[in-house]
Amino acid sequence: MSGNGASRPGGIVCPFVTPLTAEGRLDEPVFRGLIDALVPDLDGLFVLGSSGELTWLPDDVAQEVARVAVDQVAGRVPVYVGVGDTGLARTLARADRLQAAGADYLVVTAPFYYQVVDEASIVEHFVAVADRAAVPVVLYNIPQNTHLPLAPSVVGRLAEHPNIVGLKDSAGDWFAFERFLALRSDGFGVLQGREHLAAISLWSGADGVISSMANFAPRLLQELAASVRDGRPRQETLALQGRVGEVAVVFEQGAWLAGLKATLQALGWDVGEPSAPIPPCDAGQRRIVREIVTTPELRPWLTAAPSSDSGDRP
């Protein structure tokens, strides 16, 4: 437990997509339906991260996303809300607005756009957010987007803060991740953000996985986690990791976010297209996505819309 009594994060957490209408507004019925379909197979729901397009959404749409998510989840799993922004003042303002929806955790990135290179300033940024936040804070290391990696030395200092309870690491740097794992404690959890490292991360002691794949294949990730947790034969876990790799090809179809939304569309979820300027998948890319989601060996792991027959529960 952290100093404020909050549990450290863990399990299979979904960084949720934001279904959008053609006008760029939240498609609330689709959002609520997708939440209800996925929550039974999740340990947490993370809205307004990279998969949720936070940095492109108008503030009022982001607030609606947080409000509807908390309302629809209704306490079934913890709700994580992303609040990363370009600087401290904007991050604090966003945190104030979005935590009011009733989130269980705030997920905070390093400030982006300007390159902050002083370690002390980075630490001060997160400490200021954690001091002010009414709920626990999870650090989010995603240097491919922020262009500012969180070094293990920075995370180690921040892990001592009583209101900072975990880290989502999406950098894909295994050597740094091993150092992050060494920082785990009763009050600080470490989660892997790259699904291709799921098995080795869980074997090495990671508290969970936060993967965009959980938007349509949470059962596959849960089975992989259970395989590690139950101590099943190594080959069984590796076979499940191999399935993860087969499914992950959808993220290679155009921009990864376009591939994610095209996959959900192929499964019957009308989540719309990515926010401009990211282009949607073209016809050829959509054909590859459809081939993947209709592969007999993969279909049982995928969560199709109720009116779709693209996936069948195992």
Residue ranges, per PLM feature:
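Short alpha-helix boundary/capping motifs
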Residues: 66, 97, 126-127, 158, ...
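Active-site beta->alpha loop and helix N-cap motifs at the rims of alpha/beta catalytic domains
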Residues: 2-149
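Catalytic alpha/beta core domains of metabolic enzymes, predominantly
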Residues: 131, 143-252
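A general structural signal for well-ordered alpha-helical segments in protein cores
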Residues: 31, 62, 66, 91, ...
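Secondary-structure boundary/capping signal
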Residues: 77-78, 137, 166, 188, ...
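Surface-exposed charge patches
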Residues: 96, 199, 262
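C-terminal alpha-helical cap/extension of soluble enzyme domains
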Residues: 4, 8-17, 34-42, 203-206, ...
